[in-house]
Amino acid sequence: MANLFKQSRAKQKNKTTPSQTQTSTKGSARANAQVAGLRFKKSKQSKEHNTAQDANNNAITIQELDWMGQGVARGATMYFVEGALPGETCDIEVVSSKKKVVSAKTISIQGPSELRQPPFCPVFEACGGCQLQHIDADAALAYRDNALKIMMERQLSIGSGVWQAPLVGPRPQYRRKARLAIDARNPDNIKLGFREANSNKVVNLDTCPILVNPLSTAIGPLRNALEGYDSARHIGHISLIAGDNRAQVVIKHTKALEDALIETVDAFAKALGLDVVLENKQGRLRSVGEAQGLIMHTVDGCSISPSANDFIQINKVVNEKMINQALVWLDPRPNERIADWFSGLGNFTLPIAKKGALVQAIEGVAEMVLRAKDNAQQQGIENVEWLHLDLANKANVEASLQQGFDKVLLDPSREGALTVCHALVKALPKTIVYVSCNPSTFSRDAKVLINGGYEMEKAGVAEMFPFTHHMEMMALFTQRQQ
């Protein structure tokens, strides 16, 4: 771990041989070529960095990364610098500033970090899908994990021994669902891929190394199948989804597509073992041909069967590790009453129920509740009560929790679970496991639980989205001993 945090040796030496100087110059050139193409938010406030502290060289030195992977320089003013790595001295341009906190972008680098590496994707500099391919993946996780640990210790006053080792999966091919943007204004020259960062422009792709196969290898042939058809203009976006049994191409269209286009796409898909699903403007789904439903296996023989627009955890391996960790932390016992809030299709619900607990699954999307219930019945799981509820309605939430539960699992969206947490400190289940995709709202909600009589016993990150700013985390709360 220690060598992940060391600074570039080239910066630490005052004397270098001619060959070392040449190597360092080449390294700087490569690094500056990288940052020249990095994607940054534009701002009317952008201006050249020029403070009394560094007016002579217009540069700052990066000490660490924050949990999102931005370079951090601490001092009287704190700088968060996109595209910069620990140990690098960077010329920067300010994007925005507020009091003594500055957001900036890297203009050039004097002596690249040993952690800097060439992106493995040829369109990384343009594409908005990934943000962190310029750093060694293990080092990025180590820095970000440590930054999040420090943030939680500072904001929540958690004790030693709470922070757990990260849950890690495959890199880079990990993503089993993606939404592709399309530019078909010229049907003879269609662009299909992801959007540029902070732009509506589409980066044209043939493959994507982040996606699992056959999703990655389907992009180029899919674009070729669409080209030449005028009704391709009516396609809003295309989703690619990989189950464990099949994969799907889901085409969202605003007006009817011509039969010839559908037939050509279906022929392309069949050749690659894919199913085609059409989604009209009203959200109705129609399979082309004899498309099979998707099956995604999880743990303990459980599985979910998502529809095209259902939320799923996009990293299969990390998702299974999260479920297993939740089972260990919750320790569900036969006949215990356990509530699974924001339950979706039953990703956590079904494995918990398999342990014999009496589970109430509460979800805000009615269609997902119906599919989850049907899916559970097909697997012979009957000890779950499936409820559709407005999860932001205080009265409904409190009424549901008044039934009394031994343990609770939360897996909310990025908005968090503030209403539910306020109700939980009144209902007082003995154990709460919180799964979060937004550390900021998690910290807010955790304060409610801690102030309401709980202590954070365990917590840690799950690397659900390698090479991006996003970070998943999990925490175990238990009632504080009086």
From Swiss-Prot:
Compositionally biased spans, kind Low complexity: 15-28
Residues reported in the UniProt entry to bind S-adenosyl-L-methionine: 313, 342, 347, 363, 390, 411
Entry's Gene Ontology BP terms: rRNA base methylation
Residues binding [4Fe-4S] cluster: 121, 127, 130, 208
Transmembrane segments: none
TRAM domain segment(s): 51-108
Keyword Methyltransferase: yes
Entry annotated with the keyword Lipoprotein: no
Keywords, in A-Z order: 4Fe-4S, Iron, Iron-sulfur, Metal-binding, Methyltransferase, rRNA processing, S-adenosyl-L-methionine, Transferase
Active site: 437 (nucleophile)
Reaction it catalyzes: uridine(1939) in 23S rRNA + S-adenosyl-L-methionine = 5-methyluridine(1939) in 23S rRNA + S-adenosyl-L-homocysteine + H(+)
EC number from the UniProt entry: 2.1.1.190
PROSITE patterns for this protein: SAM_MT_RNA_M5U (PS51687), TRAM (PS50926), TRMA_1 (PS01230)
GO molecular function: 4 iron, 4 sulfur cluster binding; iron ion binding; RNA binding; rRNA (uridine-C5-)-methyltransferase activity
CDD domains: AdoMet_MTases (cd02440)
Span list, region Disordered: 1-33
Domain of life: Bacteria
Known function: Catalyzes the formation of 5-methyl-uridine at position 1939 (m5U1939) in 23S rRNA.
Similarity section: Belongs to the class I-like SAM-binding methyltransferase superfamily. RNA M5U methyltransferase family. RlmD subfamily.
Full protein name: 23S rRNA (uracil(1939)-C(5))-methyltransferase RlmD
Record lineage: Bacteria, Pseudomonadati, Pseudomonadota, Gammaproteobacteria, Alteromonadales
